[in-house]
UniProtKB/Swiss-Prot annotation:
Source organism of this protein record: Streptococcus pneumoniae serotype 4 (strain ATCC BAA-334 / TIGR4)
Localization per Swiss-Prot or TrEMBL: Cell membrane
Topology of the protein relative to the lipid bilayer: Lipid-anchor
Iron is among the record's keywords: no
Residue ranges occupied by any PpiC domain in the UniProt entry: 143-241
UniProt keyword Isomerase, yes or no: yes
Enzyme Commission no: 5.2.1.8
Enzyme class: isomerase
GO MF terms held by the record: peptidyl-prolyl cis-trans isomerase activity
The protein's name: Foldase protein PrsA
Signal peptide: 1-20
């Protein structure tokens, strides 16, 4: 899931280990000083109400529940492949990036594994809901491949200047893309890219504008959300090829299935409902009042006691 389900590992002592020491024992000494000590139990009592500590316990619970239910269905190679992609992306900075996030390679692997287990659970439920109605809705919203040339710029005034040149008679749009575009993936190929309505390579605003163009038409400047917070990027699009949409839904059945499943994976409400059902099925019992509310985002509030109860035993 493009959205990370679990928060980055926290550099607190294991909440579970500390909890085991919280009843009937002060546990081991963590810190000693002249005339005093800080014990595991004392530390646990201090940190258990901390939101970060509560998130750790929530993550640990989700990890254990989904590992038990789906662990045998997930190949370790999927986790290793994701790690390899991240190493390729960050290069020699990978360990530093992990450290800054409070993670080691092993905790990152565990995080990725849990995310993939949740994705697997979501996929299973979503596939069971692949109704004719769902396919029809996806088909109605689907636009097949178009090929376009795009120019991406970071400055609106610059974009307006380039647009004027792009709309001039005899303009060489490909050369304008090579000379001006900030999109390194497409500029050397004259800005050419092929995408459909399900593609994620270009922003929604750009796709919408491209689909509305006739072949050889050039858009106005399109403003889209940038990759940095509160930033914008500016696009100019020339449509070079448009695929006629078939009226036969069966021609797109596999593509539509992928579209529907991807939408479900990106639907936070749907994902939360799946996590909630698995937590309920696991019959979770909260043993410390400090943690009684950590599951409410998944299994509701005070009336969820039938599946997640608090016990002082």
């Amino acid at each position: 899931m493009k959205k990370k389900l679990l928060a980055g590992a926290i550099t607190l002592l294991s909440v579970a280990t500390l909890a085991a020491c919280s009843k009937g024992s002060e546990g081991a000494d963590l810190i000693s000083m002249k005339g005093d000590v800080i014990t595991e139990h004392q530390f646990y009592e201090q940190v258990k109400s901390n939101p970060s500590a509560q998130q750790v316990l929530l993550n640990m619970t989700i990890q254990k529940v989904f590992e038990k239910q789906y662990g045998s269905e997930l190949d370790d190679k999927e986790v290793d492949d994701t790690i390899a992609e991240e190493k390729k992306q960050y290069g020699e900075n990978y360990q530093r990036v992990l450290s800054q996030a409070g993670m080691t390679l092993e905790t990152r692997k565990a995080q990725i594994r849990t995310s993939k287990l949740v994705e697997l659970a979501v996929k299973k439920v979503a596939e069971a809901e692949l109704t004719d109605e769902a396919y029809k809705k996806a088909f109605d919203e689907y636009t097949p491949d178009v090929t376009a040339q795009i120019i991406r710029l970071n400055n609106e005034d610059k974009a307006k200047e380039v647009l004027e040149k792009a709309k001039a008679e005899g303009a060489d749009f490909a050369q304008l893309a090579k000379d001006n575009s900030t999109d390194e993936k497409t500029k050397e190929n004259g800005g050419e890219i092929t995408f459909d309505s399900a593609s994620t390579e270009v922003p929604e605003q750009v796709k919408k504008a491209a689909f509305a163009l006739d072949v050889d038409g050039v858009s106005d400047v399109i403003t889209a959300t940038g990759t940095q917070a509160y930033s914008s990027q500016y696009y100019i699009v020339k449509l070079t090829k448009k695929t006629e949409k078939s009226s036969n839904i069966d021609d797109y059945k596999e593509k539509l299935k992928t579209v529907i499943l991807t939408q479900k994976q990106n639907d936070s409400t749907f994902v939360q409902s799946i996590i909630g059902k698995e937590l309920q099925a696991a019959n979770i019992k909260v043993k410390d009042q400090a943690f009684q509310n950590i599951f409410t985002q998944y299994i509701g509030g005070g009336d969820s006691s039938s599946s997640s109860s608090t016990s002082n035993e």
